[in-house]
């Protein structure tokens, strides 16, 4: 775990230094019982990241992510937000997020099944808008092999890329770079 955290941290720091406008990606091909949830939180802590989004293709893993965060002294004061926890407080996940103390680290857990769902007009569900509007420090794709290559999953992220590119002026870029 220690080596994985150090190697990932070093890679992220070097990648951002070399290409500050490129978002680095790193894959942990970890075996079961490696401790990826705990190691992921350690990585976020070591890097000083405070907005962490965990997206999973297998919602049944939520309890492991929650328990590793709330039960370990290393993450005291960190906040865990999910649909399940929000419902237990009679709230939606977005309400729970807005109530969170923004001066402390926040971990939001969500499933692709929920994120890929749409409202009646085909848009983003109101309760999930904050996920799309937040600038996350770290996004973790968990159980990636369970559905990352499905068309709906690809569409979700392709749409995000298109939306962020809307303000890009190719002519201005060419002129500025000339």
Predicted features along the sequence, with ranges:
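SF2 helicase/translocase NTPase motor core
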Residues: 1-178
